[in-house]
Amino acid sequence: SVDKGYACGLLLENGGNLRVLEGHRAEKIILDQEGGLLVNGTTSAVVVDEGGELLVYPGGEACNCEINQGGVFMLAGKASDTLLAGGTMNNLGGEDSDTIVENGSIYRLGTDGIQLYSSGKTQNLSVNVGGRAEVHAGTLENAVIQGGTVILLSPTSADENFVVEEDRAPVELTGSVALLDGASMIIGYGADLQQSTITVQQGGVLILDGSTVKGDSVTFNIGNINLNGGKLWLITDAATQVQLKVKRLRGEGAICLQTSAKEISPDFINVKGEVTGDIHVEITDASRQTLCNALKLQP
């Protein structure tokens, strides 16, 4: 029904669209083949099925929406409690919180494939088995990754074809991030990690990718790392000096350094910051064949 700025219980398909104006509200809407919901007001309990599209403009808000396989959610306003159960969500300079990504779905922060939006932000992101999250620009604050993959792209590797909002494309990770069993996080060189605390549990993998850096030295800067049986990979090209700067590194686990350097010196890797616990260093070549292992990191 639609009455006096309020819509409820509609099925939109076959090119049918509904625009929710500022101050108006829509709830319990189903979007199917080529059905669209355009939101400048507020909406809730929207289900987006294959071929459907939900668009929330600046000033608009959406909550408790479900994006299924083949569905698309484009966000430039605000969203909360979104379930990506197989579809795609692009945050284009908006803000979302408590988003769940799973079952083959893809979440992207900061891009629509054409422009980078540095003002976007996601908070309390959950990436479960089969889910994938990509941060092209903007801020990721607090995340739990369980069986899924999160990629923070290097802000220095933006394609020339992108239009960059405000002539910059910062990528920032803040708050608490937990990598559980089967989870992986890949972070491109240059992303701002200073205000983050990353915990890597048994079976979890954190990768800091410095392979784009040319020259003899690479420095990785990060806030706090807790290794609870997990692994930290440092990827370099041909650098002969690698430094990991941390506020605090503690726990039990391994730091694995992958390099193409032909010569490995005893001081090849240096860790600067507070170090506690039982942490070992392994060094491998580009094919991950061990060059040196079982070196205990000295506090």
Task: Describe the function of each predicted region.
Residues 109-111, 229:
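A short, compositionally biased
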Residues 1-2, 18-22, 35-39, 54-58, ...:
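Short, solvent-exposed secondary-structure boundary motifs
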Residues 99, 146, 151-297:
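Extracellular beta-strand/loop-rich repeat segments of large surface/secreted proteins
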Residues 7-12, 18-20, 26-31, 37-39, ...:
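Fold-core signature of tandem repeat domains
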Residues 24, 60, 277-279:
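Generic short alpha-helical hydrophobic face used as a protein-protein interaction/packing hotspot
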Residues 14-17, 40, 64, 68, ...:
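Detector for Asparagine
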Residues 3, 21, 40, 47-49, ...:
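N-terminal non-cleavable signal-anchor helices
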